[in-house]
Amino acid sequence: MREPGFWYRPPSLLSSLLRPLGAIYGAVAAHRMAQPGTAVGVPVLCIGNFHGGGAGKTPTALALARLLLELGERPVVLSRGYGGRLHGPVSVDPGRHGAADVGDEPLMMARDIPVVVARDRVAGAALARSRGASVILMDDGFQNPAVAKDAALIVIDGDRGLGNGYVIPAGPLRAPLPPQLARTDALIVVGRGRAADPVAAAVKDNGGLLLRARFLPAEASLAALCDRPVLAFAGIGDPARFFATLRTAGINVAAERVFADHHPYAKQDLAGLTEIAGRDGFTLVTTEKDLARLRSDPAHAAFARSVVPFAVTLEFDDAKALRDFVIEKLTQARDKHRRAGRS
């Protein structure tokens, strides 16, 4: 599903007409967020968004996983597995599972870190613990109360911010902002844009940590695309950001094709892309997430080999502040668990 364009424009007649529905949706979401979660025995760090759509949760999860490994932890990612058919809990095996089974994001992350997919988050956390997790990284699920969270790190795009600030379906917010701010421990602003400044100020006023980060392209991707006109395509939450990242890196984006988030590519989609690339001499480039979907389908394997993945990592402006924050939250969580165990 593609997000409506009016979400990220000034309030309009349509968004105003939808605000009563947003008020109902928001009231339900806020009530749900207030419910107590189940403690799962190990620290839980949740990476989420205030809004629907993409903002960089997956690169953030991978960056946090690398930090946790440096700290001697054994992180396991817990994901709902959006777009996959398996309800779980199941440990993701890239050699056995495809995107249609577990979703594209878990499949991509499972190349680097253990990932558990589960619609039932508590059951998924139990499986993660059985796999030796010393820390659970919850990928999304900020608004889901099932599992008690020891820290919530919210990711936001600095260029887009929160759009019109309304709740779904009138705007992009998954719940009213005040109850979300109250549960936010850190805000990660990705990119140099200033659209997120108001919410960043609100998080700081609430005592939360503000972190800024940016995407860094992998050298291999830059080398493969240097001096070539490319046809860039993506089926992610914010394809415009992907295209902008390519251009910022100096890539000659000659053409773009946008698909819905988590789009299951069909034969005709790939035939159309191949025809344009062949006719105009373009190199095909897409996101790692899209390529994970393509590679996992045997029918699309040949096409996937013709596509260059544009790999990125997330670099924090103040890596020490993030490290200190994580260490503090892990220490607090373990102290709390010990006290609960003695009571």
UniProtKB/Swiss-Prot annotation:
According to UniProt, the reaction catalysed is: a lipid A disaccharide + ATP = a lipid IVA + ADP + H(+)
What GO MF terms are annotated?
A: ATP binding; tetraacyldisaccharide 4'-kinase activity
What EC numbers are recorded for this enzyme? 2.7.1.130
Q: Which UniProt keywords apply?
A: ATP-binding, Kinase, Lipid A biosynthesis, Lipid biosynthesis, Lipid metabolism, Nucleotide-binding, Transferase
Sites where the protein binds ATP: H51, G52, G53, G54, A55, G56, K57, T58
Q: Which GO terms describe its biological process?
A: lipid A biosynthetic process; lipopolysaccharide core region biosynthetic process
Keyword Nucleotide-binding appears in the UniProt entry: yes
Family annotation (Pfam families): LpxK (PF02606)
Q: Which GO terms describe its cellular component?
A: plasma membrane
The pathway to which it is assigned is: Glycolipid biosynthesis; lipid IV(A) biosynthesis; lipid IV(A) from (3R)-3-hydroxytetradecanoyl-[acyl-carrier-protein] and UDP-N-acetyl-alpha-D-glucosamine: step 6/6
Keyword Cytoplasm on entry: no
Q: Which PANTHER family match?
A: TETRAACYLDISACCHARIDE 4'-KINASE, TETRAACYLDISACCHARIDE 4'-KINASE, MITOCHONDRIAL-RELATED
Role played: Transfers the gamma-phosphate of ATP to the 4'-position of a tetraacyldisaccharide 1-phosphate intermediate (termed DS-1-P) to form tetraacyldisaccharide 1,4'-bis-phosphate (lipid IVA).
Q: Which family does it belong to?
A: Belongs to the LpxK family.
Protein's name in the database: Tetraacyldisaccharide 4'-kinase
